[in-house]
Amino acid sequence: VASKKLWVDRFWLVVKYALIAFATAFLIRAFLLIPVPVEGNSMEGTLKQGDMVVIEKISPIQRFDVVVFQLPDGSTYIKRVIGLPGESVKYVNDQLYIDDEPVDEDFLVKNRSNDHESASYTNDFDLESLLGVEKLGKDSYFVIGDNRRASKDSRSFGPISGEAILGNARFVYYPLTHIRLI
């Protein structure tokens, strides 16, 4: 009888720890870290088609963060934040300007072949010509893909709201040969 009670106690202890582990994993996945697949080549140079990234929902959005967001039509994208609320954004001769000040984009790998060296990597634009406004709105972010020539981003669908942002992409965990922080 004593050994049976010991076995039952151990069984319930294992069940209790398993439930705690599952609940913890569920809470982490639901509220902190979420796996997301990379689809398309608009972030080529930073992320590749088929990479799996983990996003987190806690950190505030900063310039050059790679974020995952959802548009009103339900489509999900992963892009880099270039412009923050209240800022003016423009590109002239492949140079990013925020509030008329030049900003370097050290992360950007310019995938140019020799025969396109004279071509612009990021076509010139400003918010006035794209959206008819000088500055981004109170909760608006301007996002753009690192592979500028092959990216559908804020240049085509406009700025995104902070509410649309699902989280910051923090690291690539698959494929195993590509594991790294973003």
Description of each model-found segment:
Residues A2-F11, K16, A23, L27, ...:
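Soluble "head" domains of membrane/secretory-pathway proteins
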Residues A25-E44:
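Aromatic-capped interface at the extracytoplasmic side
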